[in-house]
Amino acid sequence: MSALPIATNRYFDNHFERPGVKLLPNEFYTTAEDMVLMTVLGSCVAACLHDPYAGIGGMNHFMLPDDGADPGAAASESMRYGAYAMEVLINELIKAGGRRERFEAKVFGGAAVLAGMTTINIGDRNADFVRRYLALERIRITAEDLQGVHPRKVAFMPHSGRAMVKKLRLQVPGVTEREAALAREADRLRAARTRAQVELFAAKRPAAPQPARPRIELFGGRGTTPGAGSQAAGSPYAANLSRKQEA
């Protein structure tokens, strides 16, 4: 499993009049600075964690890969990836002086923005995961804006814990295309894993035993070794064959 990268797209936000960082899918960022963390979500989810006592916070942005397993199965690959994305954020905040028992969470995203996804709603899957994970970790959710059909623009102030969300129109240039690409990549990886499992299964199957060749006895042969289709020179049977061929 590759490391979750730290967001590096820093800029100055004129609206909030402070430095900012834009997060892309599968990135995270933590800080104690008075700045704004910004991201745009479709079916992906973002968890914003804040320690009000230490004045630090952070955000992640991720989508669970669809590995074909039960979404609630703790051992599935998608659940392991989601847990990893959350653990990276939590551990980085703890390293910076935060305390897990003081963390408060605000969660966003999980919209149904990908048309044609009839077998599973990726947004619902992501929203369900982040709720259950935080409940298991006993991190209180103080605000949420999850699911629905609209993409969202989220702004989070990690120093104060303040979060704002703006619903976007259904078709936002770049958002649907980006998440469709993520879904296609997840499907490709899933298909590759399935092929690898089939090949591994085939390689492990024991080879079928070869049937024993029937022994053929020679009629009237002396001092000969039985063999399939072999005729001993000088045997009566060989002589009979010669006479039939001459006739």
From Swiss-Prot:
InterPro entries: CheD-like_sf, Chemorcpt_Glu_NH3ase_CheD, Cytotoxic_necrot_fac-like_cat
HAMAP family the UniProt entry points to: CheD
NCBIfam families: PRK13487.1, PRK13489.1
Keyword terms: Chemotaxis, Hydrolase
Record function comment: Probably deamidates glutamine residues to glutamate on methyl-accepting chemotaxis receptors (MCPs), playing an important role in chemotaxis.
GO BP terms: chemotaxis
Source taxon at top rank: Bacteria
EC numbers, comma separated: 3.5.1.44
Catalysed reaction equations from the record: L-glutaminyl-[protein] + H2O = L-glutamyl-[protein] + NH4(+)
PANTHER family: CHEMORECEPTOR GLUTAMINE DEAMIDASE CHED-RELATED (PTHR35147:SF2)
Family designation: Belongs to the CheD family.
Protein name per UniProt: Probable chemoreceptor glutamine deamidase CheD
Enzyme class: hydrolase
CDD domains: CheD
Annotated GO MF terms: protein-glutamine glutaminase activity
Segments of this protein annotated with the region Disordered: 204-247
